Amino acid sequence: MVALAAQSHVAVAQATGSPLKIGIVGAGREGGALGTLFVKAGHPVTFSSRHPDNLKGLVAGLGPLAQAGTVAEAIAFGDVVVIAIPYAAMEEIGKAHAGALAKKALVIDVSNPIARRDGEDFVKSVGEQGGAGLVTAKLLPGAPIVRAFNAIGSGRLAGLAHRAGEPVGVPIAGDDPKAIAVAQSLIREIGFEPVLVGGLAMGRHLVPGTPLGGEHTAAEIRQIAGSLH
């Protein structure tokens, strides 16, 4: 019931053009870049990390819509939560915050299993369990997860947002129609074109180094995704 209430609140906010509160779990390069775009689009954002004091410079430069806090504070704050952490830390987030995340309207999973950081055995295990997406759903039971922004470099986001001409496409994967709709709206607001490539099982393809990695138009993403099913 709480999750439905959250989704109803978000639906009303989007219908009336009201901002959504967004919590960023992991305000490193990717989380910081995405959060910055959301602030510039008019949404209040709480950035979080293990050491929120280190985020003072980031939030000071973004003005009154940005604040820093702990991971728990960012999750409590957000109608929408963006998780941009080393993938090996996802289990820890699930153990501590799965209940709270299940009550959100949308959880955007930006995290990727990367061998050089998380270890080759860990990445192999994620693959054997169906890949990122299905594993995130297992670790965050009940959360309305959409994988997105998994394969565009953080340093490129600001320059690609709202680019002239055809927008850059962002492949997304999810199983919750309402969460997908919220994600699509937010992605368009910050200057990209969302492309639903399938359910969370397709999340295994939304990582760097795959055909869907890198920068593509929406039409190119649809063509590539069609060859992967």
Regions found by a protein language model. Name each.
Residues 63-120:
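Rossmann-like NAD(P)-binding element
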Residues 103-106, 110-162:
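Rossmann-fold NAD(P)-binding glycine/threonine-rich loop
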Residues 2-57:
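NAD(P)+-binding Rossmann beta1-loop-alpha1 motif at the extreme N-terminus of oxidoreductases
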Residues 68, 144-148, 195-199:
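General beta-strand structural signal in soluble alpha/beta enzymes
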Residues 167-229:
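Active-site-lining helix/loop region of Rossmann-like oxidoreductase modules
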Residues 56, 95, 134-137:
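Active-site phosphate/pyrophosphate- and oxyanion-stabilizing loops and adjacent acidic/basic residues
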